[in-house]
Amino acid sequence: MTNTRKTHPLXKIINHSFIDLPAPSNISAWWNFGSLLGLCLIIQILTGLFLAMHYTSDTMTAFSSVTHICRDVNYGWLIRYMHANGASMFXICLFLHVGRGMYYGSYTYFETWNIGVILLFAVMATAFMGYVLPWGQMSFWGATVITNLLSAIPYIGTTLVEWIWGGFSVDKATLTRFFAFHFILPFIIAALVMVHLLFLHETGSNNPSGLISDSDKIPFHPYYTIKDILGVLLLVLTLMALVLFSPDLLGDPDNYTPANPLTTPPHIKPEWYFLFAYAILRSIPNKLGGVLALVFSILILMLFPLLHLSKQRSMMFRPLSQCVFWIWVADLFTLTWIGGQPVEHPFIIIGQLASILYLTIILLILPTVSMIENKLLKW
């Protein structure tokens, strides 16, 4: 008699995705972040659902409702801080997952890669709208500053901003719609994840060598299920250490002050995972130019398959490209640091140089170095 997991219509899909899936025998720990992102999404949806049961999306009561969750709801503080710090873990996993794809040339699966970039945009939008919900000072001013960027769009800009606001400033209508979008987007993300996996399983996983691994495949279960469990344990350990020991480490103290449209915080800045993009935005003196640079700083990921000029897929055997890649990573750290600094000398010029380097490495230096390596290998 045949096994139910191989015949049952539903169990068959799960079997082909997580059990009998042929996987390369040599994928490293860098391949763990896909499953960790799935876990992060589940944690965020569950904690978010419980928070939504007690949260009120009204300007008068939003801040108080978050305080009520932390003080009066059973383990409300735990749920709230798991959700807030879960977002940080989500972003760390995202950056490492994308970085892995760049290093090992996974972007040559361009449907999987492009859906991944769309997912990145969707997660960033969700995180931004979630940051507005507690209705603290940084929530309010962050929403005001970021939505105002759309006014840089010629002709329709101002109308568009007022349409998004639902009025002439960030107010009750804005908060209510942001809550609605923040609630629905994670489910759209979950659906996109399915499509992401669908396209990935058409080709199978890449591996560190970048070579075709069809001749050497092993079943996903038990080998990679047990490996994923190790990743899960480390992620949960890190998240819980953060939540239980220093839950406000990555937050902004300004968000413990209720939103006040009459006083502006001295330094308006987003959550740490947006600081690199914020630094790029601020490094251009022109409003429209800054907005375009901000969008392009993420959209540039879609160009990776076109900019790949090396004869090898992975960077595993390309030491020159490796050096350039790690310089680019260091540049990202520099941008993150600059994004959190005030707009004054010497931070302005450092931010501008780091922004130029960020784009130049991707558009010019990496493709050039790839061609040099081809020549060195007489290809």
Curated annotation (Swiss-Prot):
Assigned protein family: Belongs to the cytochrome b family.
Residue ranges of the TM segments: 33-53, 77-98, 113-133, 178-198, 226-246, 288-308, 320-340, 347-367
Entry's cofactor comment: Binds 2 heme b groups non-covalently.
Mode of membrane association: Multi-pass membrane protein
Coiled coil: none
Note: Heme 1 (or BL or b562) is low-potential and absorbs at about 562 nm, and heme 2 (or BH or b566) is high-potential and absorbs at about 566 nm.
PANTHER family the UniProt entry points to: CYTOCHROME B
Oligomeric form and interacting partners: The cytochrome bc1 complex contains 11 subunits: 3 respiratory subunits (MT-CYB, CYC1 and UQCRFS1), 2 core proteins (UQCRC1 and UQCRC2) and 6 low-molecular weight proteins (UQCRH/QCR6, UQCRB/QCR7, UQCRQ/QCR8, UQCR10/QCR9, UQCR11/QCR10 and a cleavage product of UQCRFS1). This cytochrome bc1 complex then forms a dimer.
Protein location: Mitochondrion inner membrane
Cofactor(s) listed in the protein's UniProt record: heme b
Organism field: Spermophilus relictus (Relict ground squirrel)
Record-level Gene Ontology MF annotations: metal ion binding; ubiquinol-cytochrome-c reductase activity
GO term, biological process aspect, one: mitochondrial electron transport, ubiquinol to cytochrome c
GO cellular component, one term: respiratory chain complex III
Binding site for heme b b562: H83, H182
Sequence positions that bind a ubiquinone: H201
Pfam families found in the cross-reference section: Cytochrom_B_C, Cytochrome_B
Name the UniProt record assigns to this protein: Cytochrome b
Binding site for heme b b566: H97, H196
Job of this protein: Component of the ubiquinol-cytochrome c reductase complex (complex III or cytochrome b-c1 complex) that is part of the mitochondrial respiratory chain. The b-c1 complex mediates electron transfer from ubiquinol to cytochrome c. Contributes to the generation of a proton gradient across the mitochondrial membrane that is then used for ATP synthesis.
InterPro entries from the UniProt entry: Cyt_b/b6_C (IPR005798), Cyt_b/b6_C_sf (IPR036150), Cyt_b/b6_N (IPR005797), Cytb/b6-like_sf (IPR027387), Cytochrome_b (IPR030689), Cytochrome_b_C_euk/bac (IPR048260), Cytochrome_b_N_euk/bac (IPR048259), Di-haem_cyt_TM (IPR016174)
Keywords: Electron transport, Heme, Iron, Membrane, Metal-binding, Mitochondrion, Mitochondrion inner membrane, Respiratory chain, Transmembrane, Transmembrane helix, Transport, Ubiquinone
UniProt xrefs under PROSITE patterns: CYTB_CTER, CYTB_NTER
